[in-house]
Curated annotation (Swiss-Prot):
Keywords: Cytoplasm, DNA damage, DNA recombination, DNA repair, DNA-binding. This is Holliday junction branch migration complex subunit RuvA. It comes from the Bacteria. It holds the Pfam family RuvA_N. The RuvA-RuvB-RuvC complex processes Holliday junction (HJ) DNA during genetic recombination and DNA repair, while the RuvA-RuvB complex plays an important role in the rescue of blocked DNA replication forks via replication fork reversal (RFR). RuvA specifically binds to HJ cruciform DNA, conferring on it an open structure. The RuvB hexamer acts as an ATP-dependent pump, pulling dsDNA into and through the RuvAB complex. HJ branch migration allows RuvC to scan DNA until it finds its consensus sequence, where it cleaves and resolves the cruciform DNA. Residues 141-146 are annotated as: Flexible linker. Residues 146-195 are annotated as: Domain III. Has three domains with a flexible linker between the domains II and III and assumes an 'L' shape. Domain III is highly mobile and contacts RuvB. Its main location: cytoplasm. Homotetramer. Forms an RuvA(8)-RuvB(12)-Holliday junction (HJ) complex. HJ DNA is sandwiched between 2 RuvA tetramers; dsDNA enters through RuvA and exits via RuvB. An RuvB hexamer assembles on each DNA strand where it exits the tetramer. Each RuvB hexamer is contacted by two RuvA subunits (via domain III) on 2 adjacent RuvB subunits; this complex drives branch migration. In the full resolvosome a probable DNA-RuvA(4)-RuvB(12)-RuvC(2) complex forms which resolves the HJ.
Amino acid sequence: MYEYFEGIISEVTPSYVVVDVNGIGYKVFSPTPFAYKQGQKAKVYIEQIVRDTGITLYGFQDQDDKGLFLKLLSVSGIGPKSAMAIMAAEDSNSLAEAIEQGEVKYLTRFPGVGKKTASQIVLDLKGKLGDYVARLDKPENGEEISPALNDALLALIALGYTQKEVDRITPKLVEIEADTADQYIKKGLALLLKK
């Protein structure tokens, strides 16, 4: 029924935000509530779930995250709470990439996801998430990324940095001249530690 709410974030908690739209506060569960700041004007994309126990609103920063949430809900054995827990534990690009590559073991690290459910996620969604997979081939400025830089970016993700953190420093890494992935990794770590 709702596509999005645009209003002021009046409250931020570990599991939900309250969006004030013209004096009405909507409690919206979010996988990333701390991405919002209290007092900030924001557009929150909404999915409304109606159950016997009540109506619950789930909110996302963009249409892609909302779409991924809906794809997860289409998997047998995944409900809204499980889908939110999965999305809260990992950024959308990494999650979609793991599904596309059939990484069942990787998916079992999410709360409430056992081997059977992880296999079902891969079975149901593999090949359907191409839009969500990160494109490390080109940064936003359109320049080509060298194989050494691409290896370095993948290594930074493997070290535990999020896709968003790595995307933030990619344009700076493209500008430097380095011959090896090790050189890019050292510079990338220095940039990430600056924050």
